């Protein structure tokens, strides 16, 4: 199992996987283009539905995925045209559904205090408020941002 996890880490550069009990439910790579956010949302929502998550989980997972994928597209590459794709992984860890995005930026994600009239700057606040837990990890090729939802009883 350790060899599989090491191979996954080397291939994706993502480090969230630390528990051998973790089950990968799906993976998807998307280019750094805003039009791909909808595809990422549907991908995560469909997995949540297929795996019979709790009632509101598919919609919440869809919203939070939209936020972290949008952040990866907007902030995740110096030059989106030449950047590697954004890697999205959906995992199950016990009762938790974990969604992770990996991008090529080393920029540390920060929760901002957006003005009431601002049209952006609330994404990570939404992730923090609606998820069971969230965070980010640096990796050799950039960083990963992840969130967890309590998805199964």
Where in the sequence are the language-model features?
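STAS-typified acidic loop motif
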Residues: 27-39
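Histidine-centered phosphotransfer motif of kinases
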Residues: 60-78
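Conserved short strand/loop->alpha-helix "switch" segment adjacent to the catalytic nucleotide/phosphoryl-transfer site
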Residues: 42-66
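Conserved beta-strand-loop-beta-strand hairpin that lines the nucleotide-binding pocket
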Residues: 1-27, 73-153
